[in-house]
Swiss-Prot record:
It comes from Saccharomyces cerevisiae (strain ATCC 204508 / S288c). This is Protein virilizer. InterPro entries: VIR1_yeast. Its main location: cytoplasm. Disruption phenotype: Severely decreases N6-methyladenosine (m6A) levels following meiotic induction. Abnormal cell cycle arrest in meiotic interphase before premeiotic DNA replication. Increases the rate of degradation of KAR4, MUM2 and IME4 protein. Increases RME1 protein levels, and decreases IME1 transcript levels. Decreases RNA level of genes involved in translation and ribosome biogenesis, and early meiotic genes. Partially suppressed by disruption of RME1. It comes from the Eukaryota. It holds the Pfam family Vir1p. Signal peptide: none annotated. GO terms for cellular component: cytoplasm; mediator complex; nucleolus; RNA N6-methyladenosine methyltransferase complex; transcription regulator complex. Component of the MIS complex, a complex that mediates N6-methyladenosine (m6A) methylation of meiotic mRNAs and is required for initiation of meiosis, progression through the meiotic divisions and sporulation. In the complex, performs a scaffolding role stabilizing the other complex members. Present with 486 molecules/cell in log phase SD medium.
Amino acid sequence: MQKCAGHAPLVTAASRVSQDTVDALLQAILKAYHKLASIDSHINDPVEIAFKLINSFKYLPISGSSVKDFESELRELDVFSPLLQSAVTAANNSNIIWDLIAVLFAYISIHKQLHPLILHNLNIWKDFMADNDEETATTTDGDSMNFGVLSLLSIVQNFEEITPNLFEFLKLGLRSTLLKIWVAQWQRYDPSATNLINGDEKISSWITKDYQVDFFIITSLASTSSLEVLPSHYFVYKISKRISHFPNLIDPKLYRSAISTIMENGISDNGGGENSSDKIDPTDLSFHLQVLMEVIDHPELNYLQENRLILLLDIALNYLILVPTHCLHSNFGELGSTQSLASTLNIIQFLLSKFLINMGSISQLINQYNRKCITTNNINNNNINNNGVINGSTNTTSTTTTTITNNNNNSNNSSISNNNRKIDWTQSYQTRYQIPYWFEDSILPPIPPISKSLFTFDKNLDHESDSIMIVNDVLRCLNLTILLISKLLRDYDDLKINPLIQSSDDHSNEDNHVIIEQYMQLYLVPLFTSLLLAQQLKDRGQERDEGHKEKEENINLIGSSSVKKLFSQLIFFSSLKLCENLVIKEKNLALYHLIKFATKVSLDDLILQKISINLLNHLFFHQIRDGSDDDNLIKKLCLKNQLSFQALKDYITLWNDGSEVYNAFYKELFYEEQPKIKPIKLTTSDLLKLFPEDVQFVISTPPNTITSASTSDNCTSSQSAAQKNIENFTTLSKYDVYSSTSFIPSTSKNTNTNVSKQQQQPQNSTPCSSNRFLFNKSSLISQESNGSNNNSGTQGPGSMNESYSLDNSFNTTNTNMTRQPTTLTRATDAMTTAPTTPIPYKNTSGSSNNNLWIESPMTNFKGSTISKSTNKSKMVNTGKNYILGGHNKVKNNSRAQSIHIDDFENENN
């Protein structure tokens, strides 16, 4: 067991099968090729045979067999003509057949012993393209994906079975890629050439294109199984990184060579001993598990700056998914981790999803603001040009004067615009994709600051990948993490392992329901975060398809809309399978907590509500089938359990909007007619009146909308210089300074001045720069404020907008995003959540001391009711009037605060 756990073999899942089985499978595939080549398309369907072929290829390992072993047998076989004829004659399913042909072509390409099927039939492709005028019919769409063969096969291998429904779901559109790229590459390929790379210049022209690198790997490198044919170490490392993504599709010898190259590229010059990074064993299971622990030890990392860590994580996940579960647990337990293996993987899933959501939201905000600036500049330029033409019609002198004046005004306007750009770029737009604040609190353990491990550093930083490549690697790691968690759940179910079983010595049965809820949240929180990411990718891709094309200057870190759509589908499908495996393992326990969790998150955000109902719809009506009959397994579980059934019915009844997505629940589960819903329109003020009075106090009606240009300008101009100085100062201070005046010694002469200045600003005014952090720890921008601007046109009740200051956002030394709630949707949430912007303290008593150290005005915002004025019983005069410049409103952090001591001192006073 120890040997298995410490050094699990670096092999693919298929190679664990005996060689006799592999030979038998290969002979069966060859017989299928003979049948496909001689088939009569009018009698038999070649498409059916092709689907069986590509599903068999998943179990055929990549071997080092020579091409000559099958040269004579495959020379005369034509397996593509029957399929091409079916694609031409098919009416509605032609795209599915083209995707099928492309996948079959890709599988043949990665097995070098089957290359004669392509090389001896190139004339067939040439004649077909000429007869069907494919030169003009397959022009490549600028926004489509140009797959490499390895990229395509790594996608389809995520699915247990390749079916027509899968191609209909993915809509890959591989016809253009097959005919214009892959076939053309093989037509230019010369297998007799010993060296296809004639210097750095030639390889540099195609090293950035994945489909070119994939073709080089499956042809030239497959013939040598060595990286020595490459002209320089730079290209060796670049192609090694590409090879590391596909352990099941590369010759094992070549894959091991690539992994060793990556491991040796660490900081070996810093160690010099036995523990230096060039001594890392790529087959050491403990090292790959340490990579997982490194990710959760540093949850605040910006993965765009951690190219090597993400690369090692990708390698580790590809390795771990092939290791037996008992070996994983045996070795992980010896590392002394405070987290279980399942907990570690779920935390990684959450961190990767959270990073991608926040990154996408930031890029979306920047793109929207850039478009706004471009539109504003165009309007200003048009106005200037129009004024110049009008003034120019008078005389030459006035024309010159007007031009100079307009240029000066334009320069001044540009200067003002640049000064305000950092301040209001986050005020004009609001992101739609918010992670509930309690997600992070419920899943991330408190982790003290820990230094990074040496193996995460890279001694050669000149070959860093670009941001788009790193983001794609993070997306791939996220999908692998979800697949690995699903695999563990399946193994736990097969082995009858129940982590919720308590030992006989544990008598805390009264807390059993709490443990169960925490266990379910361990899976459901990352699951819904990944589904939120999938929804974000889907929506962003649809925006581009509908004509909102992003201009060249805009930030786009994921790629075209096709790439976004594909990753969205992969993450959604993998998350759906994870949820299925969780329900299969835990039965009604998981189903009830899933419905309960969906009810909770739906009240937080309408996008999460949309995700929840789509997930439930797929689970109940489109997925798992019971083996005994055709009934849905989850449907049967729900009907047998009254708790789950009633929870589901309450949820559907609450959110039913009359749409088709709710109809199946009424028709197939509740056996009743779907109630007809009459839509109504409400203004924001009318909607707020439906809230309880204490919630209305927190969610006050804004005077203007946040998208108003005048509001933004007035907000910026009304902000005093003293207030800016205070905010810049507080980012470096340990004290929590609120809306206070600049440094004025607290004396009797200026006491009234201080109070009057505090009272000049209305309490309903919009806070311009009251927030010191751009990010929250779980959401891009905090959604809760007192008197903040509220965009009622796009957000539901409980989605609040708030203006932020960018110049102060990044001055903070705190690297963690602050944990703050993102929504206020229920009275209970409002009564336990403090708004970001405090209420200015007004001293109404002339005899009382105006220089009190008070707590945050909303410190006691946890009672059953909300006090609209500061509780004076908690104000304490410590006598420290000149600390931090004598600010009147700061937390007394200079000593430990005790409510009882403070009350006692006030009573004595």
